[in-house]
Amino acid sequence: MPTLDLPRHTTVRSTLAEQYGPVLRAHAEILAECMPLVDVDHARSRIRKGQVGYDALRVLRSCGDPMPRYARVLDAFEVAGFLSNDDRRSLLHSELDVDDLVSGWFTGDRTPRDSTRRIARQAAIVVGNALLRAASALIEPATVWREWTRIVCPCCGGFPDIALRERGAGRTLVCARCDSQWRTAHQGCLSCRTVDEPTIARIANADVGYDLVMCNGCGRFLKERPRRGIESFIVERALATELDLAAEHRGLRI
């Protein structure tokens, strides 16, 4: 019987999702147990007025000391095989500050080239993402914000790092911080609204199934792919790490 070969990115995605199992479980546990402080009514009122719902750093601080959660995620990275026991211990006793790692994530610090420091940053991001996802879910558990028209996330004010192509001409944007999603009909740069080449450059990466979409005018980039077949956004971002590194090497930002 003839068989259909799956695209390489489909196989890579499913394999990585399986390998990331311990990390995804740690993320789900943090998401379920955390209790971020959010004035839900006030946040909803702000969003209706076109303003960002809450102060993300204040919400993170309301969740207490991030170190125990960070240690749990590092444990998960070790179980998953991304980190040795010695490196995990070294990171836990290093001078790296979890709050600084999260703040760097907020302000667009470059992804570390060193693999161990990159895992440390990823672990801090997993924690921060879980806490902000929980906060955003309190405001609106619906999947997609359909009436939001700004570039930044309606909930936490983060910029999108992923764009999912929908049927037709629209795209769904995904917040790099809290994974909230909102629609846009615009096909070019979200910042300067340019749509034409060569200002807009698109590089396809068949191995991961993403296009790296770069604006040479304002220096922003997005990772874009069809919506179908996506995994957890933690897995999606891990899959596309090399695209982030390539964009950052060019001096671009999300």
Sequence positions of predicted segments:
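Cys/His-clustered metal-coordination modules, chiefly Zn-binding fingers
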Residues: 136-251
